[in-house]
Amino acid sequence: MRSVWHRDSLLPEHPALTGEVRTDVLVIGGGLAGLLTARELQQRGVDVVLVEKDRICSATTAHTTAKITAQHGLIYQKLIRSIGTEGATQYYRANAEAAERLKELCRRFGVPMEEKNNFVYSSSRQKLGDELSALHKLGIPAIFEESPPLPISTAGAVGIPGQTQFHPLKLAKHLAKELTIYENSGVMELIGIYYHNRAIKPYADLRRAHKN
């Protein structure tokens, strides 16, 4: 099924890899995570090549809900139990900072985005209550929705206001312009650890560059 994001955004095609290519870092996978990783490295002066077995952003990214949020399920009650209040706070801050950096990229490239409240629903009122308490304990603004407008029965939903939804393929299109990308280039084998690393695909060979 063609995703909603493809209706108004077509990504450019990239050649398949043939022959031998040398690079400092090879990024395997051309979703948003791979594109952002490659860009971060390139911005720091690293020679990067990205390979994708199909087309970039054709799998998970193409069908994502495109949320930029620090709320990833009912996790903060679990984090407090496992790594403590300080660790849970650091987790939130790291994700909030990453969200701001991603929104800054969207603003820089003129990618459409919209501020929205993010919600996580559950059939357990106890779990929702525990999560709401955990968020408040960490000083995270949180809200409770008694009857979320969903086509299924729930016990409510816990939300964090001021999160964001964006157009993932329009961001990917801008990121891809700056990168060396090979599509239809699935990696079949990795050879070597630490030194003389190689990634092998049919009819091609990627090797770690050696610079003096």
Predicted regions span which residues?
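N-terminal Rossmann-like FAD-binding beta1-loop-alpha1 element of flavoenzymes
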Residues: 20-50
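Short, hinge-like loop/turn segments at secondary-structure boundaries
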Residues: 66-70, 161
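Extreme N-terminal leader/targeting segments of oxidoreductases
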Residues: 1-25
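Helix-loop-beta segment of a Rossmann-like dinucleotide-binding subdomain
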Residues: 110-120, 145-174
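Dinucleotide-binding Rossmann-like beta1-alpha1 core, especially the glycine-rich loop
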Residues: 71-147
